[in-house]
Amino acid sequence: MCCYCVCCTVSDFILYIVAFFFPPAAVLLRSGPCSSDFLLNVLLTLLGFLPGMLHAFYYITITSPLRNAEYVYYYQQGWVDSERNVPSNRPQNSQTPQNRPQQGSSARNVYPSVETPLLQGAAPHDNKQSLVESPPPYVP
């Protein structure tokens, strides 16, 4: 019968068995001889067997290879300033309202226009003058 455990790897299981009999040896195998965790475990084992064993179990669980997936960070590349607002060498198609593609067509705008009113009560832009005037210039 095959035993498949999702809570720990084989190396973790062996370290748990070693930690049950001699806790500093398990921490030594996982962290190395001059690490602060090993020295802490030796001190805890000298103070009492149970604190050393609990620390060894905790350290084996925390440093398990299965926990590495919890700390994966995904970064999304944003705008590159050198590529932003650079005029392209391609001729631009001037689309009049009659030549614009319809909503359901496959040709879509690369950069859709987003209308965000900055002031409450501002009318949407319908090629009309805005009712809100700009603030006066700053004069020192």
Swiss-Prot record:
Keywords for the protein's UniProt record, in alphabetical order: Isopeptide bond, Lipoprotein, Membrane, Palmitate, Phosphoprotein, Transmembrane, Transmembrane helix, Ubl conjugation, Vacuole
Compositional bias annotation for Polar residues: 85-108
Major place of residence: membrane
Residues in the Cytoplasmic compartment per record: 1-8, 63-140
Lipidation (S-palmitoyl cysteine): 2-3, 5, 7-8
InterPro entries: PMP3
Keyword ATP-binding on entry: no
Modification Phosphoserine occurs at: 134
Residue intervals annotated with topology Vacuolar: 30-41
Transmembrane segments annotated in the record for this chain: 9-29, 42-62
Family: Belongs to the UPF0057 (PMP3) family.
Other comments on record: Present with 6780 molecules/cell in log phase SD medium.
Name of the molecule in the record: Protein SNA4
Organism whose genome encodes this protein: Saccharomyces cerevisiae (strain ATCC 204508 / S288c) (Baker's yeast)
